[in-house]
Design a protein with these regions (language model features):
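Active-site cores of enzymes that catalyze phosphoryl transfer or operate on phosphate-rich substrates
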Residues: 168-190, 261-322, 627, 754-816, ...
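Active-site pocket-lining segments that scaffold enzyme catalytic pockets across diverse folds
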Residues: 189, 193-253, 567, 578-596
Length: 916
């Protein structure tokens, strides 16, 4: 419930406004005026703690009554939604004791008194009875509005004015009313048709929520005059087929084909997905001649997981359309379920992004399809709040609760919602109360768990039937008109089905084409070498930018020494360039070639380990300076953002961005790799499988700090094993690099092939500044990325008795041990890229070793983690012999908590690699 002014304001602010009000009541906001009038009324003379018995002066009586009138208006604006008729299944209006005559300070005899309120713009005089009726019509009919919690006065007053000045819905032109009926009938007839023709098949029908189509159509037709050119949509399974058919106008023939038992999508690769998860792109041409592009994102069954993906896609589309300042041309439109909106934490994460510099999209229209049930769960078991939408109050946006049985109200609020978004660049929420006519899916029996509710639903006419009856009774529709519409709907569906049957008869053994979707086809993965080196001139240009600041920039002395002067010295000496220096060189070289870069993550601008410093800050003003934005006039743009403290939503956002902007290098960095599992659903359902399921490739790069250095179980593992377990069909690339030059080349390689794949890099911690892992300038101006590297051998290959295979920083422990112990019969091979495995290169490197050579896999991670369980069967199959293991024992926890114990384990596993 909204807080009072007193609860949310400080005493100094109250005092300032009170003094202004005493001088001129009109000089303060009406809500303050009502507060002060009530305050003075409460301070009338008292006697012995009771109200004074003497009658107050006439002026005081008038002031008291007027204060109550103004309080009445304020009460309805604040609490009217609590008694609004928004539930289509409710038999009577909800009650709120705070809105009774008695609680508001009136009695029955006051109802016919003439009153007015300066709270209303027209200040029109009317009876108290008429005023209450007016307030109920505005705030407690089919629309329940929550907006008084918004502290931005202009925003709050804008909503207030739009609500109180909106025209009577019944004055809507006849042709508009007929168009609304058509939308409702199309939605209903589609579901009824599927229900009768494809009995028992899951379709997750929209029945009971058909007014969603009114909301969508209203927003669509309002887009061109509002300046919106494109809609990026996300929604779950409920009603998705109907939205595809009747809003995005996907071919009915294709939809019906997907219901066929013989349907197999003709995929270039991959496995496909069920019909109610597929994405879609279309351009709707409206009667006005205007066109609006609509993109519906493919989504998994993980409810709300698609939300940040859509936001990222929308931001990318805004960049493509050149709308990065105001962000009004591309509209994110998210459809939610009530149980999921309240229950899934990623909703709050996504809402929290809405006004952040690196993640804002100019406001999102949220539509909650509130069928008042989650599978079998009722609202009282699904949330602790009054409304499913209460979580949205944290970002202070308007929330409109709607009765889906009132399509005219749905239309009015939809127009208001888009106008609000365009005016303020903020989110807005439509909470459409409806019901679910059948079970969670069409094979489920809801009466098992909600018998009373479903008895009521069975008796309840559809919104199309109710609205048709209303139009017939008002004379806006004739019986012939209604019959003609019904015939038109049925004929359209029957013709599409007949077409499908004819095609199936002709091509019974052929695969149907996978088309009319968001699919993007690309060449297969290949390990061909890619030219990634840069020339010395380019290297110098980047270093010059990285070691230069404006004359008026007050650089912090320590930053000047450890960053600017250090970087210049490294360059002049020809190296060694440490890890993040190499990264900035890769970024800079791509920018000079016209490839933009986006990096986001927690503390990514400086780097968790204070080693990146991609953004410098003025020591006096705090103003940021990005050296890589000063390479040259024709360079591309680099965007580096410190993210909110979220993994799932931020990774989802950056993944969505990468989908629609493949020509940009998009990177997401976890603060520690251990935290990446906070985004596991984004990784599992989107990043590793989207190309197989939906033909949606992505080139996103995940940077996951990983390495065993005695920092305990929460700061050691990027969960390498989980990513390797997800590898198949060349779906992703997984790397564990050992030199800064390798990092440089792989980042450049990511943008220089004719295909894209997600890239997961286990980035180092202790190697970030280590000289032995740093590279010379020559390694950037020549060479390329190497999937597998050897080590300087200590003798002829045919004299080797042992080959130790490894990946990551344990390599350095192994070569140090070998040198220290003067071992001359053990070779070491390191996998820089663990997947896809470059088998040809590995075989070539192993050719010179005797067949009797002992093969050992060495890793820092426990035996049930790291690469062992992934790589061992592949090596055994490749070489036809057993592979010995050297590493930590299997463990439930990634690492020990004791530094001393860690060191003991590390020393033992390194020694074992030369003994097992």
């Amino acid at each position: 419930m909204p807080t009072s002014i007193a609860a949310r304001a400080n005493l100094e602010l109250i005092d300032q406004n009170y003094q202004r009000w005493q001088e001129d009541p009109a000089s303060v906001d009406p809500s303050w005026s009502a507060f002060f009038e009530g305050f003075e009324l409460g301070n009338l003379p008292q006697r012995n703690g009771a109200a004074a018995t003497a009658a107050p002066r006439a002026g005081v009586r008038e002031s008291s009554f007027q204060t109550r009138i103004d309080g009445l208006v304020y009460a309805y604006r604040t609490l009217g939604h609590t008694i609004a008729r928004v539930n289509p299944l409710a038999e009577k209006r909800p009650e709120n004791p705070s809105l009774t005559l008695r609680e508001l300070g009136f009695s029955e005899k006051d109802l016919d008194l003439r009153v007015s309120s300066k709270f209303f713009a027209d200040n029109e005089e009317m009876t108290l009875r008429e005023m209450i009726a007016r307030l109920q019509k505005i705030y407690a009919d089919s629309i329940g509005a929550e907006f008084m919690h918004i502290q931005n006065t202009r925003m709050r007053n804008w909503v207030l004015h739009r609500l109180e000045s909106r025209p009577d819905k019944h004055s809507t032109p006849r042709q508009v009313k007929i168009a609304l009926l058509r939308a409702l009938m199309e939605a209903e007839s589609f579901e009824v048709f599927l229900h009768s023709r494809y009995v028992g098949q899951k379709r997750f029908s929209i029945q009971g929520a058909e007014s969603l189509m009114v909301i969508l159509d209203t927003i669509l037709h309002k887009c061109p005059p509002a300046g919106v050119e494109e809609i990026c949509m996300g929604m779950s399974h409920r009603g998705r087929l109907n939205v595809l058919a009747n809003f995005l106008k996907k071919s009915l023939r294709v939809i019906f084909t997907e219901f066929s038992e013989n349907y197999i999508p003709e995929l270039v690769a991959g496995d496909g997905d069920v019909k109610y998860h597929l994405g879609y792109r279309t351009v709707r041409k409206l009667a006005s001649g205007a066109e609006v592009e609509i993109r519906l994102s493919a989504n998994p069954s993980h409810l709300e997981a698609v939300d940040p993906v859509v936001e990222g896609t929308a931001r990318a589309r805004q960049r493509i359309r050149g709308d990065t300042e105001h962000r009004r041309k591309v509209l994110p439109l998210l459809l939610h379920g009530d149980a999921a909106f309240a229950g899934q934490g990623i909703v709050a994460e996504t809402l929290n992004m809405s006004q952040l510099h690196g993640y804002g999209t100019g406001g999102t229209v949220h539509v909650v399809v509130n069928n008042q049930i989650g599978f079998t769960t009722l609202p009282e078991d699904a949330r602790s709040s009054m409304y499913a939408t209460d979580i949205a109050k944290m970002i202070e946006v308007p929330i409109f609760h709607l009765n889906s049985d009132d399509p005219l109200a749905c239309m009015q609020v939809s127009k208001l919602a888009l106008d609000f978004r365009q005016e303020f660049g903020r989110d807005i929420v439509i909470d459409m109360y409806c019901y679910r006519r059948y079970g969670h899916n069409e094979g489920d029996e809801p009466a098992f768990t909600q018998p009373d509710l479903y008895a009521k639903i069975d008796r309840h006419p559809s919104v199309a039937q109710l609205y048709k009856r209303e139009l017939l009774e008002s004379g806006a529709l004739t019986e012939d008109d209604a019959a003609s519409l019904e015939t038109e709907m049925d004929l359209r569906l029957e013709m599409a089905l007949d077409n499908v049957k004819a095609i199936e008869k002709e091509k019974i053994d052929k695969q149907a084409k996978f088309k009319e979707s968001t699919a993007v086809f690309q060449p297969e993965y290949k390990s061909s070498p890619v030219a990634t080196a840069i020339n010395e001139k380019t290297l110098k240009a980047i270093v010059d930018a990285l070691t230069r600041v404006p004359d008026d920039f007050n650089i912090q002395p320590k930053i000047k020494r450890i960053i600017i002067e250090h970087r210049r010295k490294v360059f002049e000496n020809g190296g060694p360039f440490e890890w993040h220096y190499a990264e900035l060189l890769a970024f800079g070289s791509l920018l000079l070639e016209g490839t933009p870069v986006r990096l986001s993550g927690q503390d990514s601008a400086r780097g968790t380990f204070s080693s990146r410093h991609a953004i410098l800050y003025d020591a006096k003003s705090g103003a940021p300076y990005v050296p890589l934005m000063h390479l040259g006039e024709k360079q591309a743009r680099i965007c580096i953002y410190n993210s909110l403290l979220s993994e799932a939503a931020v990774l989802g956002f950056d993944y969505g961005y990468s989908l629609d902007y493949p020509s940009m290098l998009c990177l997401w960095e976890a603060q520690f790799g251990d935290f990446a599992n906070g985004a596991q659903s984004i990784i599992d359902q989107f990043i590793v499988s989207a190309e197989s399921k939906w033909q949606r490739p992505s080139g996103i790069v995940l940077l996951l700090p990983h390495g065993y250095e005695g920092q305990g179980p929460e700061h050691s593992s990027g969960r390498l094993e989980r990513f390797l377990q997800l590898c198949a069909e060349d779906n992703i690339q997984v790397c564990n690099l050992t030199t800064s030059a390798q990092y440089f080349h792989i980042l450049r390689r990511q943008m220089k092939r004719d295909f894209i794949k997600p890239l997961v890099i286990m980035t180092p911690k202790s190697l970030l500044r280590a000289e032995f892992a740093s590279s010379s300038a020559k390694e950037f101006t020549s060479g390329k990325f190497e999937e597998i590297l050897g080590s300087p051998e200590v003798g002829p290959a045919d004299k080797m008795k042992r080959v130790i295979l490894c990946s990551g920083k344990v390599y350095y422990d192994l070569i140090n041990y070998r040198a220290e112990k003067k071992i001359d019969n053990a070779a070491i091979i390191r996998f820089e890229q663990l997947y896809p495995v470059h088998e040809t290169k590995l075989k070539s490197m192993m050719k010179g070793f005797p067949k009797t050579t002992q093969l050992v896999w060495c890793q820092e991670e426990p035996q049930n983690m790291g690469a062992w369980t992934f790589i061992e069967p592949r090596l055994r199959k490749l070489f036809g012999r057993e592979i010995a293991y050297a590493g930590r024992d299997a463990s439930a926890s990634p690492a020990v908590g004791s530094l001393a114990l860690h060191k003991r384990e590390q020393a033992a596993l390194v020694a074992d690699a030369f003994k097992v």
